[in-house]
Amino acid sequence: VSILAFKKEKEIYAATYAWFTQVGEEVVVGLLGEQSITTHNLKVGDYCGISVCSKEQKDVALYIGDTHSNEVDKLLGLPYFVDSTGAITLKGSKVTMIAKVVDIIHLQGIEADSLVYFKVVEYHDNEKLDYLLMNDIR
């Protein structure tokens, strides 16, 4: 379970996503749902933070996933870091990445969703923490 977050034009966007995977040494791909305000505001060339949740972040992942960025400040009260590009990463995550959007593709059969290719420019792994899995939140 991962959280994608970024600041753009003074607005903060964050969403919980179930599927991100590494497909190259510095390339991550994510399938982002059509219903997400965050997905609609993500453009090629944007930088964003990808926080791979730790087991301790179950409630955070559920809260961010159950709300919309245009309705509430999803990160209010949460410890996070914003870098100079506007990428936001959550403190306490298993893995944090700063990534640049390289391409956004709409695949046949799931055109509404966005398959997003990211180039990872910064990567940190907290080896003391365990990954939050989908089975942990069902």
What are these language model-derived features?
Residues V1-R138:
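Basic, polyanion-binding surface patches
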